[in-house]
């Protein structure tokens, strides 16, 4: 292991320290020193995206941070981490992709119930071209006097390479972001995923007209988004193998520093899967940092656990220091 990698790992793995302030979010607890506002961010086609803006109540704002969700992950998962970054002086935006979370249109009648996704048109390529691209633009227009940094969790990291405006991003931090080819997943999880997607998810999606969350993902997904994801998971080079995805060329345009965090107990974003995704960013030299639960002083992290508030004095602090390194 190189001295550079050791140094990077040390940024994220150190003994637990006394919390910096009691007001930092714990779960859904209030952030005493952070202004939190639920807003609407218009996508490229004016579709309303449910979003939350986190701002420090006092002090100078030093950086803008855009947090991009994993597939079928509501933005509220990132609330604690977003609040922590805002406490440190960042303007932070979280949001839901169209057809998910608070970016799902409401039914015309019926106690604020979400509208059916049957017939709703949205693919993962649409999320990239219309939603994420617009979120980057929205942050750049409002915070143009400060570095715009990018946090991508799982799909949220993958999509950076598809953005036509990824040059606007100063630096990017990937958390459990990978090329999701099923054979690169750890065993036996790879077989469970293969069976679930092909023998449960795809048939249900074609039958119902959308992927019902109760079938295993926890959140309903638009039909086209789910089926496009399944097609990528079955390809050896994941989205890089999709000849219809012309925005793959945008991977070569991102030139900022890129650090990819690989959690060693994550069965989805294994080291080979993270390396495959990072290989697409040819105009920069991605730095891959492997972190084990022992490094963070916990028993388990996995694919989703980085964003648990228990990591605010270890993993979160290292992430924040790296994101804010550029002045």
What is the predicted function of each stretch?
Residues 6-56:
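N-terminal cap/lid segment of alpha/beta-hydrolase-fold proteins
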Residues 62, 67-73:
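Active-site glycine-rich loops that stabilize anionic/oxyanionic intermediates
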Residues 75-115:
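Conserved alpha/beta-hydrolase
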Residues 116-142:
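Alpha/beta-hydrolase active-site loop
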Residues 151-237:
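Alpha/beta-hydrolase-fold enzymes
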Residues 254, 260-262:
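Short beta-strand/loop motif that positions the catalytic acidic residue
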Residues 269-280:
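Short alpha-helix in the alpha/beta-hydrolase fold that links the catalytic acid
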Residues 287, 291-327:
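Catalytic active-site module of serine/aspartate enzymes centered on a nucleophile-bearing elbow/loop
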